[in-house]
Amino acid sequence: MGKTECWYIIDCPDDAKLVVGHNAKSQEELSDMIHEGRWDEFIRYVPIKKGDFIQIDPGTVHAITSGCMILETQQNSDITYRVYDYDRLTNGKPRELHVDKSIDVITVQAKSTEDSVMDTNNLPQNKWNKLIECEYYKVYKLVLDGELEFEQSHPFLNMSVLDGEGTVNGQRIKLSLIHI
């Protein structure tokens, strides 16, 4: 059980990190760390930079940190289990946590940090570079210099322009990010 998703880092501070995974070595240690609130010991932070890509498999503890702008693609799912919420309040009240359900679905041991983040900054130009293909979606990155024509052969396509300008189906598109 869980939700498959991925994040493309559009922008982030120079020293940015995301929560991806945890440091528990066994199911028992996972449960102990969570129930005892040993968050600094439990949570695994992964350094990131603009242009990084992260595939987040079901059962992976994950969270976006302050100042990070991401593009998220995910499996259609109504389920989110929150194991920790940094003691934030919504309308003066803590948000609902799902501690026991989270413990049941979190993968032990977590994927290694090295296997979590892909640098997409130096991919070939004018080529569809596949970042991930899974049961729920395919994600490509296209760095375009010049023109490219392609035929849309899939029933659904979502294209996101992250930087620059161009023309898509006769529509002029220009984008400049506000850096955060």
Q: In which residue ranges do the predicted regions lie?
A:
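Active-site region of the double-stranded beta-helix
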Residues: 1-50, 65-165, 169-172
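Glycine-rich, mobile lid/loop segments that gate access to catalytic sites or pores
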Residues: 53
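Conserved small/polar residues in nucleotide/adenosyl-binding loops
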Residues: 178-180
